[in-house]
Amino acid sequence: MYYYSWPYNYPFLPEMMGFWAFVAFVFGTCIGSFLNVCIWRIPREESIFSPPSRCPKCGHWIRWYENIPLLSWTFLRGKCSQCGNRISFRYFFVELLTGVMFLLVWLRIIFEQKPLALAIIYFAVTMLVITTVFIDIEHRIIPDETTYPVMFVGLAVPLIFPEVWGRDTRLEAFIVSFAGFAVALLLMLAFSLAG
C-alpha cells in the first residue's frame, strides 16, 4: 500500500490496481481513436475537432457505435458499413498501441511511486510521439503541430519534476533538457539547409 502526501497520494487499495490498469488501457484506446483523426487531418491542414469523422470514399458520417475503439473496427471487419471501403489496419493498431502505452505509463507511475501528475505529462508526450511517428510514416513529414509541443514539454517538465531526468535540482534537470533541445534544434536546422 502507498501512503504519500500529494502528489504522491494513491487513493486506491492494492486490490483496485487491476481495475485502474484496465481504465488506463481503455482510456488510452479512446485517445488512440482521437490520434487517428489527428494523423489523418493534420497533414491535410483540416480541423481535428470538426466535422465528425466520415468515410473518405462515400462520405458516410461515422456513428458513435461505429467508432468504439478496437471493437468497431473488429466487428465491421475493417470496412465502411455503407460502401464497404477498406478501413486501414492502422486505425486499429494506433488504438491498441496507445492503450498499451498508457497502461505501461500508468504501471510505471504506480510501481515507481512517481507523482500522479507526472502521468498526465507522460500521456501527453505519448500522444504527440505516436501522432508524429505515424504522420511521418505515411507522409514523410514531421508537422510543427506536434514538434513544438514536444519541445515545450521537454523544457518545462524538468522545472516541475527534476527527477524525470534523474537530477536533484531543477537547474540541473533544465540544463540536461536544454542540451537535448539544442541538439534537436541543430539537427532540424541541418536537415532544413540540406533540403
Model-based region annotation:
Residues 1-17:
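Short, strongly hydrophobic alpha-helical membrane anchors
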Residues 2-7, 97-109, 155-161:
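Membrane-embedded alpha-helical segments in integral membrane proteins
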Residues 12-20, 86, 90, 110-118, ...:
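Juxtamembrane/transmembrane-helix boundary motifs in multi-pass membrane proteins
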Residues 24, 114, 124-195:
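Functional transmembrane core segments of multi-pass inner-membrane proteins
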Residues 29, 33-37, 103, 181, ...:
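Transmembrane alpha-helical segments of multi-pass membrane transport proteins and ion-pumping complexes
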Residues 35-91:
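Membrane-proximal soluble regions of multi-pass membrane proteins
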Residues 41-49, 107-111, 137, 163-166:
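Transmembrane helix-loop junctions in multipass membrane proteins, especially transporters and channels
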Residues 76-77, 81-148:
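Long, charge-rich boundary regions
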